[in-house]
Amino acid sequence: TFDYDTIFTSKTIEALLALLMHSGVDAIAPLQTKREANAVMFALPGVTPEQQTTVDEDWFKKPVQRVATAHFGCTFLRCAALKKTPKPWFLAKANEQGEFTGGHVDEDIAFWRAWESAGNTLGIATHVSVGHAELMITWPSRTTEGGKIQQHTTEYWNSGQQAPEGAWGFVA
C-alpha cells in the first residue's frame, strides 16, 4: 500500500521487498513518523495504540521486529496472507457512546487486528524509514530576519482560525 503523502525512493522499495522475502513476516512496513507529532507509528504486541511506548537501542539491532500495528504509507502485504484476513478489512468501530472522538478503533487498527486474528504477522523494518509530508501554512513575519512563520493546518483550525503570534497583517 502507498499513501500520497509518503516520501520514499526505489531503494526503499528494494530494501522492504528483500526484508519481506527473507524475514518470514507476512507484511512489512518502514519506520514512519506521525504528522505533527513526535511519534513513530507502530504499536508493539500487547500494547494498545493509545499507549506510548519506547524501545531500547538494542531493539534496532534486528533488521525486522514484530509489531501489532504499523502505518500503511509504504507497506507490503503477502497476497496469501491478505486472502486469509477476514472482511471487512477497514471497518472503524465507534466507542461505547457511538462516537469517534476517542476510545474508538480506527480503520487501520481494525485491519491489523483482523490481520493478526487470521494468524498473519507484521514486521517493522528497523533500518528503513520513509518521510511523511505535512501541509504547512506560511505567514509573512513581522520580523525581517525570519521573513516567515509556519503553522500546522490543524493548529490553525483548532485555534479558531487564528494566525500565529508574530504573523503580519492577518485579519480574522
Residue ranges of model-derived segments:
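Surface-exposed, flexible loop/turn segments at secondary-structure boundaries
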Residues: 7, 33-36, 130, 138
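Preference for short coil/turn "hinge" residues that link or interrupt alpha-helices
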Residues: 1, 60-63, 123
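Generic alpha-helical scaffold signal
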Residues: 7-10, 105
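Short beta-strand-to-loop acidic/aromatic patch adjacent to the donor-nucleotide binding site
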Residues: 1-7
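Conserved catalytic core of nucleotide-sugar-dependent glycosyltransferases
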Residues: 9-96
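C-terminal catalytic/acceptor-binding lobe
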Residues: 84-172
